[in-house]
Structures are given as structure tokens and as C-alpha cells.
Amino acid sequence: FTQGQYTRAVEESNSAEIISKVLYPSDNHTEGKLLRLTQQYFLVSASVQSIIRDHMAVYGRLDNLPDKVAIHINDTHPALCVPELMRILIDDYCFSWDQAWDITTRTMSYTNHTVMPEALETWNESLFSFRLPRIHMIIKEINERFCKQAWDKFPGNWSRITNMSILCNGMVRMANLAVIG
């Protein structure tokens, strides 16, 4: 290693370790928010990948996932499992969007235990797209398709569609993602 390579290797190792060393970091600054988002994604991704791996070991296919597995989202923090399951089905197992969406929506369920706005997690969309670009792409597509369906059902009712949208005013609304997924 040259000094530059060694320093970079140590920085990468420290970045990887911090994910599990600091639980619930302060999120009153960008670094804390990025760490918290990274932690949430790390835990969701590991969980969904484990579920998929176990399912594949038993059944060897994923088209029957909703018949054998139920993933219940009990808070807004793990709502990233919706786009993460989509990512795995599309990117790793070559499902079409429609096939992946059908499997995802039949596998996921969500219970909300509060209606207090401050308890319904949101993320700054630019921070989100910086940290999780592929997940952001998937959420944008989910949102676009959902808003089109909402427009078809409630033509001209922008207020209603805006209230239900995942992406709004530069924010990613996790409860809306969980409900739609």
C-alpha cells in the first residue's frame, strides 16, 4: 500500500464499521442523517436478502414468494424494504417491473400506529438520492406510476394526489411509500 491507498482503506473500513457502532446517531446535521439513512438501508437490505436467500434455498423460485412469506412493516423506518425488494427482484433476478411490483405488493403489509406528522418519517430527496441512488430511482418510478393511477381515479384532484404522493416538495415520505407498497 502507498500512504494514499492505506489511508483510503482505513477510511473505508471506518465508514463500514460506523454503521453498527453508533445506534440512532444525532440527525441534526447532514452526517448524522446520512448515517441514519445508511443504517436503515443496511438493516433492511440484509433482512430482505436473508429472506430471499432462505426462500430460494427451499423453493428455488420467487414467483411464489407472496404465498410463502409475509413482510410486515410496523413503522416508517423499515419502509425501504419496498424498493429494496423491487431492486432485488429486478436487478438480481431479472423480473420485469410489473412482475416485481405484483410480488412486492402481495408480500408487503404496513401498520401505522400514529397519525402525528412528526412521527411519520421523511427524508430530504437530494440527500436520499445521494446516498441511495438506485433505491431513489425505484421510488421515483413507484411514485410516477402511483400518481398516474391516482390521476386516472381522481382526475384533476391535485390536492388529493399530492397528499398521497411519496415524493413531495423535495421530501421522500416513508409512510406513503409503505402504504403504496
Which sequence ranges carry the predicted segments?
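A conserved ligand/cofactor-binding region detector
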Residues: 1-181
